[in-house]
Swiss-Prot record:
Residues 162-187 are annotated as: Disordered. It comes from Homo sapiens (Human). The lineage of its organism: Eukaryota, Metazoa, Chordata, Craniata, Vertebrata. Pfam families: bMERB_dom. GO terms for cellular component: microtubule cytoskeleton. One of its GO terms (biological process) is negative regulation of cell motility involved in cerebral cortex radial glia guided migration. This is bMERB domain-containing protein 1. Residues 3-150 form the bMERB domain.
Length: 204
């Protein structure tokens, strides 16, 4: 029994020490790796250039802005539709009161008529403010579109020089237009402007 214990102790002493994190252990692992694996020092996709990554991020930012614009546009549309509905309801009630002869109107009916006129006036003013805000937002978006188009045009120039071969660059003398960017339909603004027009609410 004592002979077995001494033999096992002797075998354990002869085993090489493996200290994780030591220089010797790290060198032993790297010997089994290929040259291509050792060259990869980043988890990012190495086939993309820094300029391409920056351009891709700019496009993603652009898409995010388009979604935010669309959400804002839908909110404008919902507010305008609700205002038009409220104004039309008040206007219908006012028309019913106006149809009553003046001599037959009670005091409460006259008071209600004045209240309806004031409410309609306030709602029309509120809608005018909404239209003005939509116009300011549209002008701001146009300025942002211009800045983004200039930015993408500047960023695409060096990439075109790298990706195009000399033969293709000689063949394509004509300059290409800037990349098409996502656009938001002006449905909300058009609806805000036309909702109370002659063909719609006839509020004014």
């Amino acid at each position: 029994m004592e002979l077995k214990q001494s033999l096992s102790t002797h075998l354990e002493a002869e085993k090489p020490l493996r200290r994780y994190g030591a220089v010797e252990e790290t060198a032993w692992k790297t010997e089994r790796l290929g040259r291509n694996q050792l060259d990869i020092i980043s988890m990012a996709e190495t086939t993309m250039m820094p300029e391409e990554i920056e351009l891709e991020m700019a496009k993603i930012q652009r898409l995010r802005e388009v979604l935010v614009r669309r959400e804002s546009e839908l909110r404008f549309m919902m507010d305008d539709i609700q205002l038009c509905k409220d104004i039309m309801d008040l206007k219908q009630e006012l028309q019913n009161l106006v149809a009553i002869p003046e001599k037959e109107k009670t005091k409460l009916q006259k008071q209600r008529e004045d209240e309806l006129i004031q409410k309609i006036h306030k709602l029309v003013q509120k809608r005018d403010f909404l239209v003005d805000d939509a116009e300011v937002e549209r002008l701001r978006e146009q300025e942002e579109d211009k800045e983004m188009a200039d930015f993408l045009r500047i960023k695409l120039k060096p990439l075109d020089k790298v990706t195009k071969s000399p033969a293709s660059s000689r063949a394509e003398k004509k300059a290409e237009p800037p990349p098409s960017k996502p656009t938001v339909a002006k449905t909300g603004l058009a609806l805000i402007k036309d909702c109370c027009g002659a063909t719609q609410c006839n509020i004014m």
